[in-house]
A protein has these predicted regions:
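Cytosolic catalytic domains that perform sulfur/thiol-centered chemistry
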Residues: 1-279
Length: 279
């Protein structure tokens, strides 16, 4: 496994080995508001249930988009409650091929905590490998951590920068094709003019991230090699974080438009393109 991929993803076998060896691993089961309640889903033994909407995001405003970044001190308090210290190894996972876990991974790295990886394949791959699960509902560690976090360690952009990058660089839309194309007669649907469709689902095969060589070829074809500025958005920043994780595994670190389409479309003065072409 390449260094970049190993810094982004952890395999089922690697995690099982760490847990068996007693390594200081903090396991976080990442849930969104549409997912199953903690009591309705099995977990990897010892995993803490965490929520994107409340633990990794601030309260949204009219123009912020659905998933604004958390206040750094709130995130730090949560991380300490989960038992995270500077030397902890954090593994985030979900039951949706990394769609939620990737946003948690990105947020930790944005906050300066780099020793965090996404469990490749998540809970589905864990159970498919015959590994044990638990129904215990845990929300905090038995011993608080001491980690210190600081915002700004991953690149982010706002709407004005997104518009500029769409013209002069590469702006990727990580939503599915239907959302990108939009609906005729509905002006708040479609995409940012100039953006390219790069659905985050294209980075997955069989519930896991595609092999490194496939992702490298995919992104090389999509981005070129002229050094253009690259940024990613989606509906609310989750699928975009998943796409960024995939690119990060190949050594790339594009910027995230955190507000994404939910922020862009909240301002009716902003232009919208519809159809399959960038526009």
């Amino acid at each position: 496994m390449s260094d970049a991929r190993a810094q982004t993803l952890i395999t089922i076998a690697e995690l099982a080995s760490l847990l068996q060896g007693g390594a200081p691993v903090v396991l976080l089961d990442v849930i969104d508001e549409k997912g199953a309640a903690p009591e309705d889903r099995p977990k990897i033994p010892g995993a803490l249930s965490v929520h994107l909407a409340t633990d990794f995001s601030d309260k949204p405003t009219k123009l912020s988009g659905r998933r604004p970044l958390p206040k750094i001190m709130d995130l730090q308090a949560n991380a300490r409650r989960w038992g995270i210290s500077r030397d902890s190894q954090v593994v985030v996972y979900d039951s949706s091929a990394g769609a939620q876990a990737s946003r948690a991974w990105w947020t930790f790295r944005w906050a300066g905590f780099r020793n965090v990886r996404i469990l490749d394949g998540g809970l589905a791959a864990w159970t498919a490998a015959g590994k044990p699960t638990s129904t215990d509902i845990l929300s905090e560690a038995t011993k608080a951590g001491t980690v210190a976090l600081q915002a700004g360690h991953m690149p982010t952009i706002e709407a004005q920068q997104a518009a500029r990058i769409a013209r002069s660089g590469v702006l990727l839309d990580a939503r599915g094709k239907a959302a990108f194309v939009g609906e005729a007669g509905k002006p708040a649907t479609g995409h940012i003019p100039g953006a390219k469709l790069a659905a985050s689902g294209d980075n997955i095969a069989g519930g896991q991230f595609r092999p490194a060589a496939e992702l490298e070829a995919q992104f090389a074809a999509l981005l070129g090699n002229d050094g253009s500025e690259v940024a990613v958005y989606c509906g609310s920043g989750n699928a975009a974080a998943h796409a960024i994780a995939a690119m990060h595994s190949t050594g790339r670190t594009p910027a995230l438009y955190v507000g994404s389409w939910s922020a862009w479309s909240a301002d009716p003065s902003r232009p919208v393109a519809q159809g399959a072409e960038p526009g």
